[in-house]
Amino acid sequence: MSPTDTTPLLYSWDDQSRHQDPDWHKLRNYHGAWYRRISRRRFSQFIFAFGLMTLFVLVYSISSNLHTPTQFTGHKVRGRRGAVASEVPVCSDIGVSMLADGGNAVDAAIASTFCIGVVNFFSSGIGGGGFMLIKHPNETAQSLTFREIAPGNVSKHMFDKNPMLAQVGPLSIAIPGELAGLYEAWKSHGLLDWSKLLEPNVKLAREGFPVTRAMERVLKLPEMAHLLKDPIWQPILMPNGKVLRAGDKMFRPAYAKTLEIIANKGIEPFYRGELTNSMVKFIQDNGGIVTVEDFGNYSTVFADALHTSYRGHDVYTCTLPTSGPALIEGLNILDGYPLNTPSLAFPKRLHLEVEAMKWLSAGRTQFGDPDFLPLDHLDVVSKLLSKEFASQIRNNISLSKTYPWEHYNPSYDLPISHGTTHVSTVDSNNLAVSITSTVNLLFGSQLMDPVTGVVFNDQMDDFSIPGASNAFNLSPSPWNFIEPFKRPQSSSAPTILTDINGDFEMALGASGGSRIVTAVLDSIIKRIDMDYDIESMVASARPHHQLLPDILILESGFSKSVATRMKKYGHKVWRLKQHDTPLSQIQAVTRHHSEYYGMSDPRKYGQAAAY
């Protein structure tokens, strides 16, 4: 469709002309296979009868279902010795307490991540996995992968007949990596005793903690009703027959005992000991295929981080299977445009940003676990990260119009990812950490071992499932098919920036599934090109485009006139309403002169802390 076509490109709820647009029907069909369980719940395989507006909004609210106004309000914090940003205020405080007790940014990040797994355990915990980026001053940044791995007894066709089994239940569980990752980071970089990092979290789980507003929102979701009736979950989520509300105390005694064992004995009991036996027995009793050997064979991966330069700033991010390479591709594309000059003033600047999002989304279809990619394909991925390739891409970008999705040449279809939480930390020595962790969908597999209190992930859902092409005639990505001990692709993009002098500038990352990498890209543009302070960078409205579906989503902070102007470039625009679920949630820390600032995204009710 060209910009001169008369078909409306900006729709509202009452605009019935959208039903005449074939792309809207493609959108519905495209997501049908993956959203049988909307917002981390069981969902009928044939639920296309839902109204398109309802389906579309639900599709883009999978990671959190947290409804907040887009006129987001929050406040940055400031300190002289470091800062921590997380989605839970008490977890940011725990991180800062580690700094105050002589710990460093790695200690703070570990303690805060443990805390989120206690408090907001619908999105994170030691039953999940993730990625960490660590940057010491004057040293090469390190990427730590502790993504979950598929069990040994899997096959790539195991979910062909029923993809729902990859989203909920025992077969959806991959081998957790979070605990191994946190322990490896501590061994390599931590200063405090291991037990010190767990002590406040054991206390929270045992003595109780206030239910967050985010947790209250989750528990009110209709799809959570079955968990509230489950005899394992009910004592935690609905004690005394009443669903807990924000501010009420929640207790997790079994999880407290598990964390206490880990504090005293390290990770051995979890991967090769008493905790392993309990977890494996529970999973197998429920029909799972995870074995004790699977846990014992788990290992993390340390590697040099990926790097690019943007306007003279060094940008570091995590390696495959994250979406860090896609972030680098997007930044390399935009680095060739003077976005802060009058010639590329708004909305042309926004148009170019969206074009970069579409190209990086096409690039993501080439990604997978690097340990399972052939060498010649790794060369293909490396090409995507080069400045030369970005220059070629710019030759295929128009300053006056967008193109149909085929122009961007995606190779394969990818599953839509979900969930996550993020923590960013920095200390007085300018050691910075950016860590993203997840159990995937809400409460992961929705299975919790009553003995250990561990909530297991459903990360098998992040693999691609062989089968028919999607509504856009793209086949599932073979690079992301299930194989024993393989890690699925991830949308995570932990990121650290240094300034033109090589000094720490910012650590950031996001939660929000497939919207993570576009949120990080947008934040970097606002920080470097538009000179936003950290508060404005995090709280301002964000755009999102992931190429397929071919829809530009704008948070409601963008005016309707902006959406209309983007329409003139040929973009199909969906402008969210004020109380629609936000696209993503950023956690960021920065340094300015001798002071440190932290900002937690108010979209998820977070609060940073500084010291």
From Swiss-Prot:
Entry's transmembrane regions: 43-63
Active site, UniProt feature: 420 (nucleophile)
Lumenal side: 64-611
One biological process term in Gene Ontology: glutathione catabolic process
Stretches in topological domain Cytoplasmic: 1-42
EC number(s) given by UniProt: 3.4.19.13, 2.3.2.2
Free-text description of this protein's post-translational modifications in UniProt: Cleaved by autocatalysis into a large and a small subunit.
Compartments where found: Vacuole membrane
Keywords: Acyltransferase, Glycoprotein, Hydrolase, Membrane, Protease, Signal-anchor, Transferase, Transmembrane, Transmembrane helix, Vacuole
Glycosylation sites recorded in the entry for this protein: 138, 153, 297, 396
GO terms assigned for molecular function: glutathione hydrolase activity; leukotriene C4 gamma-glutamyl transferase activity
GO cellular component: fungal-type vacuole; plasma membrane; vacuolar membrane
Topological type in the membrane: Single-pass type II membrane protein
Induction field: Induced upon nitrogen starvation and oxidative stress.
Binding, L-glutamate: 147, 438, 440, 459, 462, 490-491, 512-513
Domain of life: Eukaryota
Catalytic activity: an N-terminal (5-L-glutamyl)-[peptide] + an alpha-amino acid = 5-L-glutamyl amino acid + an N-terminal L-alpha-aminoacyl-[peptide]; glutathione + H2O = L-cysteinylglycine + L-glutamate; an S-substituted glutathione + H2O = an S-substituted L-cysteinylglycine + L-glutamate
Complex and partners: Heterodimer composed of the light and heavy chains. The active site is located in the light chain.
Entry similarity comment: Belongs to the gamma-glutamyltransferase family.
Protein purpose: Catalyzes the transfer of the gamma-glutamyl moiety of glutathione (GSH) and other gamma-glutamyl compounds to amino acids and peptides. Major GSH-degrading enzyme, catalyzing the hydrolytic release of L-glutamate from GSH. Plays a role in the turnover of the vacuolar GSH, serving as an alternative nitrogen source during nitrogen starvation.
NCBIfam families found in the cross-reference section: g_glut_trans
Name this polypeptide is given: Glutathione hydrolase proenzyme 2
Biological source species: Schizosaccharomyces pombe (strain 972 / ATCC 24843)
